[in-house]
Design a protein with these regions (language model features):
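Active-site neighborhoods of divalent-metal-dependent phosphate/nucleic-acid chemistry enzymes
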Residues: 74-119
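Phosphate- and divalent-cation-binding pockets in alpha/beta enzyme and binding domains
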Residues: 23, 43, 85, 122-124
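Short, well-structured N-terminal submotif of metal-dependent ribonuclease cores
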Residues: 1-40, 51-64, 127, 142
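Acidic, PIN/NYN-like endoribonuclease modules and their adjacent C-terminal/linker elements
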Residues: 1-3, 103, 107-142
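Short loop->beta-strand "edge-of-pocket" segments that line small-molecule binding or catalytic clefts
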Residues: 31-35, 70, 112
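Active-site-proximal, substrate-binding regions of enzyme catalytic domains
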Residues: 45-77, 83-85
C-alpha cells in the first residue's frame, strides 16, 4: 500500500458527480493510504457552498456530503509545518499558497500529490516540483 496526497479537486469528486468522478472513486477504492493537509476541509466546504449557491446542490445535500468527508480522509495533516516551504514556493512560482500546501504535504511524506487542477500542474511543469504531482487524468492504479 502506498501513500498518496489528494487535494480538494480530487476529493470533491468523491462527494458529488463531476467530470472524472469515476477515476477519483477508483483512486479511493485502491486501498492506498490517502492523506491531505487539514486545509482540505475548508476547500471542500467552499466548493460545496459554491455548488449550493449555483443551484447544483441543496443546502442539506451539501451538508450531508461535507459530513461524509472524514470517511474518505480520516488522516489529515497539520499545516503548521508545511507553511514555510509552501510560502517560499508560492512566492517563487507566483501561485496561491493553497496548492503549494498540498504539494508540500506530498513532499513531506514522500508521496505523489494527485490533483485534477490542470492549471496548477501546468504552473509547476518544468520545475523540480513537478515530479511530485500526478494529474488525476494520468493516475493509474499500481
Amino acid at each position: 500500500m502506498r501513500t498518496l496526497v489528494v487535494d480538494a479537486s480530487v476529493a470533491v469528486k468523491w462527494l458529488v458527480l463531476e467530470d472524472m468522478s469515476d477515476v477519483a472513486k477508483e483512486l479511493y477504492g485502491t486501498g492506498d493510504h490517502l492523506v491531505a493537509p487539514r486545509l482540505i476541509t475548508t476547500e471542500i466546504a467552499n466548493a460545496l457552498a459554491r455548488k449550493t449557491m449555483q443551484g447544483m446542490l441543496t443546502r442539506d445535500e451539501a451538508k450531508y456530503h461535507f459530513s461524509s468527508l472524514p470517511q474518505f480522509l480520516p488522516d489529515l495533516m497539520d499545516v503548521d509545518e508545511l507553511i514555510e516551504p509552501a510560502f517560499e514556493n508560492a512566492c517563487t512560482l507566483r501561485h496561491p499558497i493553497y496548492d503549494l500546501l498540498y504539494l508540500e504535504a506530498a513532499r513531506k511524506v514522500d508521496a505523489q500529490l494527485v490533483t485534477a487542477d490542470r492549471r496548477f500542474a501546468a504552473k509547476i511543469a518544468g520545475t523540480d516540483l513537478a515530479r511530485h504531482v500526478t494529474l488525476l487524468s494520468d493516475w493509474r492504479p499500481e
